[in-house]
Amino acid sequence: EILRCLVGSEMCIRDREKYHSYKGEVGKVAENILDRDFSTTAPMQKWTTDVSQFGFSWGKCYLSPILDMNTNEIISYDLSQSANMEQIQRMLAGAFTKFPSVDGLIFHSDQGWQYQHVYFRQALKDHKIIQSMSRKGNCYDNCIMETFFGRMKNEMFYGHEKEYSSFETFAKAVDGYINYYNNERIQEKTKWMPPTKFREASMCT
């Protein structure tokens, strides 16, 4: 699992337009509870998040998803032309509406300013979630999220940039891709099932 993760996360080294959210200690930095232990025994044990940047001739936009480390499912996501706290609020609202009871879950991220923010920390605390952060500047501590971004960009972004003539057209494509990824794209890790089907099967046993 770790080897596959590290190979897939080559994107964190070669990404042409990586978004850097680290702005120093602007809030509270959480301990690295995860410590590269990506193992799980069931869904809803460990989530991870990050923000990835997409550049076009008409501007930039930012994708902020939450990924379940057991199923690889995208739990919630928000695409915005501004990487701001409102984007994170919408992402969290989507996740907690879908899964309101996540007591004891570990939620991992990098040390981006959004995740140090009092709103983010309090939202996790209110849902009895344990916050974990990567070491500063170490993308391998969050390589599962980096792997997803790399796969997504290879499959629907690199070489296709000119197909997206506006934010609206790209947003529609992102919605379509994540729906496909969650509900149709099979993976070896999920016993050759799409992530959502794997979660549903796991939670029924």
Predicted regions, residues:
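RNase H-like two-metal-ion nuclease catalytic core shared by retroviral integrases
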Residues: 21-25, 109-111, 117-119, 133-153, ...
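An active-site-proximal beta-strand-loop segment
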Residues: 36-75, 81-85
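Short small-residue beta-strand/loop micro-motif enriched in glycine and branched aliphatics
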Residues: 73-77, 131-134, 158-160
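C-terminal domain-tail junction helix/linker
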Residues: 125-129, 153-205
